[in-house]
């Protein structure tokens, strides 16, 4: 009876754990960037007769995930009947119903405003610091100076003291599609600001923070990249797994043949404002392919060539980045044509590298075609304790492109050393050979 109750208890616990895992959470976990998030900081700087003036800033603390054009969209729901009188450095996408105002019409009267960044070239009297980049928000490791965005908002019909102000709720962040989940606003210590000479400090009247984390599952996106492998010691080229990012279908326009005589007209007439990739017809149907080639074996070093190919006719990837995980990054000696930074997600273990293009040279990955690729070579020093070409050790454990996890080939498909098949066959035949030898011995000497 006790054993039955124990089994029932374990079953219930497993069911609870399973269903609780289905409940949406504001926390997401990326094993290569466990602390990555976008923090929204709301600083109330000035009280007004019917509200306040605040500066809202977005800090992208993600190491390698950035927001590309057409940029971020930040939304929330007002706690009471607040309105937005005016804005600098950003704008609400809709004004809403402001018909009750006879004069001095507000910038936005919606209960749930959605804010976007202003474009580069905006007049100076409409700008503030860290604004007007078209919603582009770079990653913290790649370009920390441009990993911040800000706008100023004048709020009316709101509280005018720390005790009467009500923080907004239900924050949303789009990039521009789904993927981010935001927690509740939390009042924190007021932000302090330092004068240019560093001799005076001022502070906000009130500050609250909102933390938003990204999940590829929440984004409901199919994979956007895949990995192919090859080596100097094996003629086999392991392609991306079939249907890595989708499968070809009979629907016209689902992909474009790279050698089609009508290629230019198809690409030019397609809706370029759409975020849906227009990809070249391949077996994997991914917009991006990362190829890892084990190129040369030296006495004390070994060399790898990485090629990133764009199969998307609809997008140039600006400020692209690549994250790869391999134990030999602790012994990386030289990298050509790319920038490099060690991420160290596990502290002392240096096995994760972030790679990105050199500004004005290859930081822009062009659309699909002859120029739609970037490449680099990496030189590693051999560690006698761990280095081997056996069993696919020389290939990466994980690969991310622009923060998205790429589809890897199955490990049993990796290029093996030429004598690997002989070793495997020998290990299989060894028991049979032993038995046959024993039987022969018995027959002869019995």
UniProtKB/Swiss-Prot annotation:
Disulfide bonds: none annotated. A lipid is attached at residue 420 (GPI-anchor amidated alanine). Glycans are attached at residues 37, 162, 170, 209, 234, 316, 331, 350, 419. It is a lipid-anchor; GPI-anchor. It holds the Pfam family COB_C. Residues 1-28 form the signal peptide. Residues 421-446 form a propeptide. Keywords: Cell membrane, Glycoprotein, GPI-anchor, Lipoprotein, Membrane, Signal. GO terms for cellular component: plasma membrane; side of membrane. It is found in: Cell membrane. It comes from the Eukaryota. GO terms for biological process: cellulose microfibril organization; plant-type cell wall cellulose biosynthetic process. Its main location: membrane. Involved in determining the orientation of cell expansion, probably by playing an important role in cellulose deposition. May act by recruiting cellulose synthesizing complexes to discrete positions on the cell surface. Belongs to the COBRA family. This is COBRA-like protein 1.
């Amino acid at each position: 009876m006790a054993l039955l109750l124990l089994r029932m208890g374990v079953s219930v616990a497993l069911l609870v754990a399973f269903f609780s895992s289905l409940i949406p959470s504001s926390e997401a976990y990326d094993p290569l960037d466990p602390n990555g998030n976008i923090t929204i900081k709301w600083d109330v700087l000035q009280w007004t007769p019917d509200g306040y003036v605040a500066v809202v800033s977005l800090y992208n603390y993600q190491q390698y995930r950035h927001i590309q054009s057409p940029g971020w969209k930040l939304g929330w729901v007002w706690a009471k009947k607040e309105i937005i009188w005016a804005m600098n450095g950003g704008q609400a996408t809709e004004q809403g119903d402001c018909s009750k105002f006879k004069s001095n019409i507000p910038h936005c009267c919606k209960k749930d405003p959605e804010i976007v960044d202003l474009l580069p070239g905006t007049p100076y009297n409409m700008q503030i610091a860290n604004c007007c980049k078209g919603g582009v928000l770079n990653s913290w490791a790649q370009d920390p100076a441009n990993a911040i965005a800000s706008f100023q908002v004048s709020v009316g019909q709101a509280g005018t003291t720390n005790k009467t102000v009500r923080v907004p709720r239900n924050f949303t962040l789009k990039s521009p599609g789904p993927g981010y989940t935001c927690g509740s606003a939390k009042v924190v210590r007021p932000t302090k600001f330092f004068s240019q000479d560093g001799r005076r400090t001022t502070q906000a009247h009130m500050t609250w923070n909102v933390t938003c984390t990204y999940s590829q599952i929440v984004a409901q996106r199919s994979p956007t990249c895949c990995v192919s492998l090859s080596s100097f010691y094996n003629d086999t080229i392991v392609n991306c797994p079939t249907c890595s990012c989708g499968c070809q279908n009979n629907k016209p326009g689902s992909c474009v043949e790279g050698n089609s005589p009508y290629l230019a007209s198809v690409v030019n007439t397609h809706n370029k404002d759409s975020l849906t990739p227009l990809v070249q017809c391949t077996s994997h149907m991914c917009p991006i392919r990362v190829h890892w080639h084990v190129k040369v074996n030296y006495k004390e070093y070994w060399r790898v060539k990485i090629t990133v190919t764009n199969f998307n006719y609809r997008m140039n990837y600006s400020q692209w980045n690549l994250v790869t995980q391999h134990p030999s990054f602790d012994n990386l000696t030289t990298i050509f044509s790319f920038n490099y930074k060690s991420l160290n997600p596990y502290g002392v273990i240096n096995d994760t590298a972030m790679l990105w293009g050199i500004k004005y040279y290859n930081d822009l990955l062009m659309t699909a075609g002859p120029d739609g690729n970037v490449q680099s070579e990496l030189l590693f020093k051999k560690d006698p304790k761990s280095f081997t070409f056996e069993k696919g050790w020389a290939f990466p454990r994980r690969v991310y492109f622009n923060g998205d996890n790429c589809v890897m080939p199955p490990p049993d498909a990796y290029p093996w050393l030429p004598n690997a098949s002989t070793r495997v066959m020998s290990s299989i035949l060894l028991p049979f050979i032993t038995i046959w030898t024993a039987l022969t011995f018995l027959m002869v000497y019995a």
